[in-house]
Amino acid sequence: MSLGLGLSLYSNAQIDKNATRETKALYHNLKKLSKKHVLFGHQHATEYGHGWSGEADRSDVKSVTGSYPAVIGIDFMGFSGRSPEDIAKSVATLRQNVIDTYQRGGVTTVAWHFSNPASGGGFYWKDSISVAAMPLIKPYGSHHEAYKEILRTIGDFAKSTKGQDGKLVPMIFRPFHEFDGGWFWWGKPHCSREDFMDVWHFTVSYLRDTLGVHNFIYAFSPDNKFTTEEMFLERYPGDDWVDMVGMDNYGDFGRDGKYNLTAGIQKLKIVSDYAQKAHKLAAFTETGLESIPNTTWWTETLLKALKTEKMRLAYVLVWRNDTRSPTHYYAPYPGQVSEPDFLKFYQDPYTLFENDLRKIYKKKFLGLF
C-alpha cells in the first residue's frame, strides 16, 4: 500500500485533517472493529470504584474479569469553576490517568460536566442559578473571553498529555452531552438551536484551529428523547464538525424498573445508520442500570440490544461506581449479583476489553490478541 493511500484511509471523514497519526489510526481502527465487535467502557473506572479510591492498578471491572475496560471515561469537570491550585491538581491527576490508559493500549473518552461559567454555579440547571449561559459564551457574548480561557486549559492539557513514545494521546472528546434534556444549563430548554450550534462550532474551531489541538475525536451525544433521524439531528452541528455520533440512554434500559428495549434498539439503529451514511463513528456513549439488580442484564438486555440489527457501534460505556454510595454503581464488583452474567458478557467474542486490543494506535493495525 502506498503512503498516500494509507493516509487517505485514516483521514476518512475525520474533521481534523491535521490530526496526529495516532488519532487517525484510532479513528480508523474503531471503525474497523465496530463491524464485528463493540468495545466495553466504564466511566472513572481507574480513578475510583465501589468502596475504594485512588488505588494504583485497580478497577472494579478488572477485579471481576482480569482486564481493564477497553474504554476509560474521564471528565473535564475539574478544569474550571475552582481555584487555580485545584485545577492544576485535577489536570495533573487526569494527565497521568490518560497516559496510563494509553500505555496499556486502552482508549480514553472525555465527558464534560461543565460548571456554568456565567453564574459560578454547577453544571445542573437547578444548581447554576438558572443562568442561560450558551448565548453568553459564544462569540461576542459577555462571557466569551472567560470561555476561551477555559478552553485554553483544555488545550494545554491535550497538548501536554504524551505517552512514553513521545506521542500525544488521542482522546474522544464529548462536550455538551444530553443537550436535548433540561437538566444541564446547556440543555434544549435553556438555549436556542442557533446558540447551541454556534458554541459547538466555536469550541471545535478554537481548540483545533487556534490552539492547535490535533489529538481529539469529537463526539455528539444527545440523550434518548428522539424517535426519528430528523429529531436526532435537530441540533447536529454538521458533518464538518463531528467525528462520532452517539446516544446516552438509561431510560429504555431498565431505569426505575422500566424497560423498552424495542425503543432503545430503534434509537441505537438511528445512530448507527446515520454514522454509516455520513461515514462517521457511532457509539452508545452512556448507559447502565444502577445497582444492577437484574442478574442477567448484561446478556439479556445490553448484549441483546447491541447485537440486534447488525449495528456498528465503536463502544458502549456504563456509568461510574461511586466510592461511598452503597447503591450508585453501574459495573459489577466481586460478589455483586450480576457478576456471573457479566463474565458471560466479557467472554462473548462480540465484546472487547482492554486485554483484547492490540496496537489500536498504529496505522498497521494488527487486530486483536
Predicted features along the sequence, with ranges:
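Bacterial Sec-dependent N-terminal signal peptides
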Residues: 1-14
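N-terminal module-boundary/linker segments of secreted carbohydrate-active enzymes
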Residues: 13-73, 77, 86-89, 349-369
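Alpha-helical scaffolding within the catalytic cores
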Residues: 24-26, 52-61, 92-96, 154-157, ...
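Substrate-binding cleft of secreted/luminal carbohydrate-active enzymes
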Residues: 34, 38-45, 280-369
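Hydrophobic faces of well-ordered beta-strands that scaffold small-molecule active sites
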Residues: 38-42, 70-74, 108-110, 171-175, ...
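Aromatic-lined carbohydrate-recognition surfaces of secreted/lumenal glycan-active proteins
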Residues: 41-43, 174-176, 200-230, 280-293, ...
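Aromatic- and acid-rich polysaccharide-binding/catalytic face
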Residues: 72-74, 232-261, 319-321
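Substrate-binding cleft of extracellular glycoside hydrolase catalytic domains
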Residues: 77, 81-204, 209, 213
